[in-house]
A protein has these predicted regions:
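Sec-dependent signal peptide recognition
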Residues: 1-5
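C-terminal motif of bacterial Sec signal peptides marking the signal peptidase cleavage site
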Residues: 11-14
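Acidic/polar, low-complexity intrinsically disordered N-terminal segments immediately downstream
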Residues: 16-189, 334-382
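Contiguous, well-ordered beta-strand patches that form the walls/edges
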Residues: 62-123, 200-327
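Acidic, serine/threonine- and glycine-rich low-complexity intrinsically disordered segments
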Residues: 141-231, 235-238, 258-260, 265-275, ...
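Signal peptide-directed secreted proteins
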Residues: 192-195, 216-219, 225-227, 285-382
Length: 382
């Protein structure tokens, strides 16, 4: 009889313990922009990302957050059966895992915060979630690199007689000469001539660039910010938002990560048919670069000036993809068409100089040995 009483008491005690066991009110859930995710990075909204919340099955105070890109964006190009690695939340990381300790359960809500180190990055996180909604704030410090906390202005534009007439634009294109008039011409000289002669709103192309882009800053959180104007006539410089362009530095190269969703949310959708043709043909390669990072070479000279550029390994595959389009006369005509053209000088320049270059583009591309396109910069005063 005494043994039966002891067993009965033990049974009731066991049931009582089970009733008091704390359970996480949220099961494994994937949060995205369209599924309740409010993600901020350095205090500003970050779009196009995914956070998977996974509770610990044996300890309700623990969970993991898996940060990655939104896989739906990587599948925009349905012609590809293979989906490339997606650019994640932290620049250079396709996936980042945060291990939550001491999570607080408040009714149907979970509250958490902590610090995680991932591949040299220090990630401070704070957030909360209920079923179907998550708020997550990240403050990130990237590994130290030579560009962090530096700002650069556009190199000053010279003239055909003094300084560098192409600055701040950097172009080096080594290819066989192409037919031009009664002789031949090399593409490097042709580009220099056109950039120095063509004018938009009374300014040559290098001057135009310097007139709308003033400064580029590499922030320690992995963001790149630009100081810019929407138009030459604007009197004040604007600062670009965060989480649009991000970077890492690895093996002497800068890898640029563009937030596809963030760009689409702010992009001006005006484009002519020819540009749409080019974008469509390049979409698979563009998606690869957006997801894996665009490799930029950079050189800092003894004078402190920096040249940042896309190299042959990036540009030549792109050029080979679009080169066949220039064999189509209608495509070239559409590309050159500009209903707003009013200057006879501009018309002569396009017909006499630019059109022969575009027609010869397949030949130029097929004989290209080296190509660099980028920016020439000088360190900004602090």
């Amino acid at each position: 009889y005494l043994f039966a009483v002891i067993c009965t008491i033990g049974l009731f005690t066991s049931c009582s313990d089970d009733d008091e066991k704390v359970l996480c009110p949220i099961g494994e859930t994937t949060f995205t922009d369209s599924k309740g995710l409010q993600l901020t990075y350095s205090g500003e909204m970050m779009l196009g990302k995914s956070v998977i919340f996974t509770p610990n099955s044996s300890d309700a105070t623990k969970a993991t957050l898996t940060l990655t890109g939104n896989r739906e964006l990587a599948m925009i190009d349905t012609r590809e059966t293979h989906v490339p690695p997606i650019s994640g939340v932290i620049p250079g990381q396709s996936t980042t895992t945060l291990n939550i300790e001491n999570m607080i359960i408040d009714g149907n809500k979970v509250i958490f915060e902590g610090v995680e180190e991932s591949n040299g990055c220090i990630i401070k996180y704070k957030g909360d979630a209920i079923s179907g909604e998550m708020n997550l704030a990240l403050e990130v410090t990237m590994p130290s690199n030579p560009l962090a906390n530096t700002s650069w202005n556009m190199a000053p534009t010279g003239s055909m007689w003094e300084g560098d007439p192409m600055a701040p634009i950097h172009v080096k294109w080594d290819a066989d000469e192409f037919p031009f008039g009664n002789g031949t011409w090399d593409i490097n000289s042709a580009i220099t001539m056109i950039f120095s002669m063509a004018q938009i709103e009374g300014k040559h192309i290098p001057e135009l660039l310097s007139g709308v882009l003033n400064k580029v800053t590499f922030l320690p959180d992995g963001n790149i910010q630009a100081e810019y104007k929407d138009a030459l006539t604007d009197t004040e410089w604007k600062t670009s938002g965060l989480n649009i362009a991000m970077y890492t530095v690895k093996d002497g190269q800068v890898f640029l990560f563009l937030n596809f969703a963030q760009i689409l949310a702010t992009v001006n959708e005006r484009a002519n048919d020819s540009m749409n043709d080019i974008v469509a043909s390049l979409l698979p390669q563009l998606l690869q670069m957006v997801n894996r990072g665009i490799p930029l070479s950079y050189i800092v000279g003894e004078d402190g000036k920096m040249t940042v550029y896309l190299g042959t390994e990036v540009l030549l595959p792109i050029l080979k993809t679009v080169a066949p389009l220039f064999e189509n006369e209608e495509f070239v005509a559409r590309l050159l068409d500009n209903p707003e053209r009013t200057s006879w000088r501009e018309a002569v320049l396009i017909e006499s100089f630019l059109k022969p270059i575009l027609v010869a583009m397949p030949q130029i591309v097929s004989t290209t040995k080296d190509i660099q396109i980028g920016l020439k910069l000088v360190q900004a005063e602090k």
